[in-house]
């Protein structure tokens, strides 16, 4: 191609030039929560859309973790996107050698059966080499995640008929869940081997997962016990690979160490887990003659639930959300903490993340001991003291209450921090109005599906709370339980001391920042500046038309892109915005005038 023309000789050249850039729509309703759950991956982000999804991944709560579970589930009553991170403090995985090894101790007298596999990443990078190599003490199968819930699992297997011709399949309890007996796979035939297939069933022995004891949770038909086996289409078919990749309940551990199998692979086939030997025509059923239906049912045990999470474990979970470029999130929702000082520590830590990201807010509630079970006056004092210990920040949003909700899983009433529902109200405001509308008041600020609140402050108490930048949650006669304030924790008088303004600017900044990526590495000239202005102004006009701002001005010209700025390879644009203000105080003047007075004479005088 020539320097100044598209061709050195006469020709027709077609070019497409795209000047249709717009400021993109951005999400404003995604939450992030770290808590203690009975099941599920640890220190890994999982996006859930509703309560049923929360149960499916993290299991229904018991009494120990009901508060954290319902804190997450109540946010999902208002919206449909919550990243959940499970923390772990001492939780251990159940495994199939728990009974034989539960009394084993090391040289220091410590129990040696502790197994902790927290997530797929943890398994792949650390634990697989320790527990999957047939030389550890994990047993043949390990529960997928830490927790006593894994003790409800049983893994049952059925090998191919043995060399004596015994058809194990006919004597197996779970034959009805499979189409036919296991035989020889195509992989084995291709490698001059026989009888390598095996069926595996994962059973909910006690009914803790499904509510029905003995339910079949998963089935894996026609797996191969030959190491490295694949299906005709090239997919892994070695039973350890399949379980590791597909099972939601177990990992495949060390076969040789499981007491149910005995030493040296007795009762399971002495060639299981080996490569087929083409020269010797491997018969993978060798050694399975002692198989029985009872022997096939490997009960998992030794699983231990997590204790209450420490500050370090909670903050480690939230560290997964510290990079705004890799994960989109709008609310960082802290769980209930162990002490008042812990609640302050976590709130201030999350505020630091929010201020670094500049695209999310942190709704927080005081510690439970200062709110539940104390007088309303003391609760008010404690809420204000809690707020006074927090950092000054427009990214913090403080409320004063706990919500009384019904825990249907444990048939009890519990109190949960209000902050997750406060975040939910803000997310719901995005759907019914826009982020720049106040979430407070009877139009948008009602709390859903709650029985009561710990305290309902009166007018005087609400005044004291609001002065301390604490948003009261109150039971207002004729209205219900509502968020009765829309302040951030910005203590300096500012437009950013209101939630709607903070969230307005978050939305605008995110959208325009995305649009600005299109001008990176372009020339800082009049054309590029005009292109940028033509992208930004329609966005601001639309927000103005939807009542988010009253006026604006975009400056992006030679006045702020001086020759010095251009020579530094910089680009400067300034957006001047007058945000809409929510009504916090209403004054109604009722003026009596004499009969003969013209209203024009008195209007404006009072």
Give short role names for the model-derived ranges:
Residues 1-112, 139-140, 144, 194, ...:
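Structured, hydrophobic secondary-structure cores that serve as assembly/anchoring elements
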Residues 52-58, 70-73, 91-93, 100-233, ...:
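Extended, beta-strand-rich, solvent-exposed assembly scaffolds of outer structural proteins
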């Amino acid at each position: 191609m020539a320097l100044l023309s598209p061709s050195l000789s006469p020709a027709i050249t077609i070019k497409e030039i795209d000047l249709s850039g717009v400021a993109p729509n951005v999400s404003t309703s995604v939450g992030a929560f770290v808590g203690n759950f009975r099941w599920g991956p640890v220190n890994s982000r999982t996006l859930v859309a509703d309560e049923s999804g929360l149960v499916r991944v993290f299991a229904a709560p018991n009494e120990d973790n009901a508060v954290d579970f319902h804190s997450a589930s109540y946010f999902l009553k208002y919206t449909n996107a919550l990243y959940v991170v499970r923390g772990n403090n001492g939780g251990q995985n159940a495994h199939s050698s728990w009974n034989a090894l539960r009394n084993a101790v090391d040289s220091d007298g410590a129990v040696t059966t502790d197994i902790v596999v927290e997530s797929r990443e943890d398994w792949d990078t650390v634990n697989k080499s320790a527990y999957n190599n047939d030389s550890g003490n994990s047993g043949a199968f390990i529960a997928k995640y830490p927790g006593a819930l894994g003790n409800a699992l049983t893994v049952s297997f059925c090998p191919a008929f043995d060399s004596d011709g015994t058809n194990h399949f006919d004597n197996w309890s779970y034959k009805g869940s499979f189409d036919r007996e296991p035989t020889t796979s195509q992989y084995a035939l291709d490698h001059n081997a026989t009888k390598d297939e095996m069926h595996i069933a994962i059973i909910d022995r006690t009914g803790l997962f499904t509510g029905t004891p003995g339910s079949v949770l998963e089935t894996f038909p026609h797996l191969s016990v030959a190491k490295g086996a694949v299906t005709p289409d090239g997919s892994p078919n070695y039973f350890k690979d399949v379980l590791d990749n597909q099972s939601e309940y177990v990992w495949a551990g060390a076969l040789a160490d499981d007491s149910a199998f005995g030493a040296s692979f007795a009762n399971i086939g002495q060639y299981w887990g080996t490569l087929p030997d083409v020269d010797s025509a491997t018969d993978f059923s060798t050694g399975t003659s002692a198989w029985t239906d009872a022997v096939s049912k490997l009960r998992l045990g030794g699983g231990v639930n997590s204790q209450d999470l420490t500050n370090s474990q909670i903050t480690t979970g939230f560290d997964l959300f510290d990079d705004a470029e890799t994960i989109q999130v709008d609310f960082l929702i802290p769980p209930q903490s162990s002490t008042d000082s812990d609640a302050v520590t976590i709130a201030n830590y999350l505020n630091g993340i929010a201020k670094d990201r500049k695209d999310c807010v942190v709704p927080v509630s005081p510690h439970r001991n200062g709110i539940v079970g104390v007088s309303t006056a003391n609760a008010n004092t404690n809420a204000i003291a809690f707020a006074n210990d927090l950092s000054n920040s427009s990214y913090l949003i403080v409320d004063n209450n706990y919500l009384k909700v019904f825990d249907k899983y444990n048939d009890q009433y519990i109190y949960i921090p209000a902050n997750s529902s406060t975040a939910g109200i803000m997310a719901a405001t995005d759907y019914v109005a826009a982020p720049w509308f106040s979430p407070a008041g009877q139009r948008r600020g009602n709390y859903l599906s709650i029985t009561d609140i710990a305290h309902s402050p009166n007018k005087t108490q609400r005044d004291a709370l609001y002065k301390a930048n604490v948003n009261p949650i109150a039971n207002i006669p004729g209205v219900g339980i509502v968020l009765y304030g829309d302040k951030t924790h910005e203590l300096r008088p500012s437009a950013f001391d209101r939630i709607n303004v903070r969230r307005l600017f978050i939305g605008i900044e995110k959208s325009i920042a995305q649009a600005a990526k299109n001008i990176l590495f372009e020339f800082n000239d009049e054309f590029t500046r005009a292109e940028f202005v033509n992208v930004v102004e329609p966005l601001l006009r639309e927000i103005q038309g939807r009542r988010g701002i009253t006026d604006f001005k975009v400056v992006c010209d030679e006045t702020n892109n001086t020759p010095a700025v251009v020579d530094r390879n910089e680009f400067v644009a300034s957006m001047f915005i007058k945000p809409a203000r929510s009504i916090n105080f209403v004054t109604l003047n009722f003026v009596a005038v004499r009969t003969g007075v013209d209203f024009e004479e008195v209007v404006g005088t009072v």
